[in-house]
């Protein structure tokens, strides 16, 4: 089963809280993790294969995830391949700017 964490904060960035939440909902069968945040004008996304700590281990992996609204996702594969293109949250700007995890 996948894990999803969403946070809205009136006055501050949410990426650290989403990261901490993803750590809590992950399990050993997980193959990918990602976070998307919204700063009021732009969507910021980072997603990689691996457990949460592996997906965000590179310096700066979370530094660009600014914004007071965000969603995080850990993927437990039941279909598809072991590829970063399967990692979520998914983002599209057509026809509307939206990011989602399921």
Describe each model-derived feature in a short phrase.
Residues 1-102:
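N-terminal glutamine amidotransferase
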